[in-house]
From Swiss-Prot:
This is Putative type II restriction enzyme MjaORF1200P. Coiled coil: none annotated. The lineage of its organism: Archaea, Methanobacteriati, Methanobacteriota, Methanomada group, Methanococci. It comes from the Archaea. It comes from Methanocaldococcus jannaschii (strain ATCC 43067 / DSM 2661 / JAL-1 / JCM 10045 / NBRC 100440). A putative type II restriction enzyme, its methylase would be M.MjaORF1200P (AC Q58600).
Amino acid sequence: MRKMFICLHNTYSAKQVEEFGRIAYGFDINTIVVTKATASAAQSGIPTLHKMAYKLGKNVLFFEELDDAIEVLRPEKVFLIGNKSICDEKVDFNEVGENDLVVFCGASTGFTKLELEKGLGRYIVENEIGALGNLAIFLYEMSKKI
């Protein structure tokens, strides 16, 4: 699971960035990707995440857009984790591999249709629990595979 890229996309909250990092690094993810961060997420969330990563010997990659992350990282698959109203299929944790990019949307509105075309839209639970809840469940389920 260490090589998997975990991404927080479209966030404006510094606290969300910090908590996302705490959860991902807590599950021993080596590299967190952040795309389309604005407002306090970009101004104070990213620097806080960099500090956390440095102290833990982990990595942070920050891109302006999701397309940039896909271009640079060249993942085998891109999973966009959203809610059931926009994603048709439930996540099959067995289909997620080490060289995949797994993207969680920080905005309460979820992914746009254009963003969903960039990968495989999947949901984890029936109800909307947000990026942090989805991340925690996802990483817990993935950790059971090891």
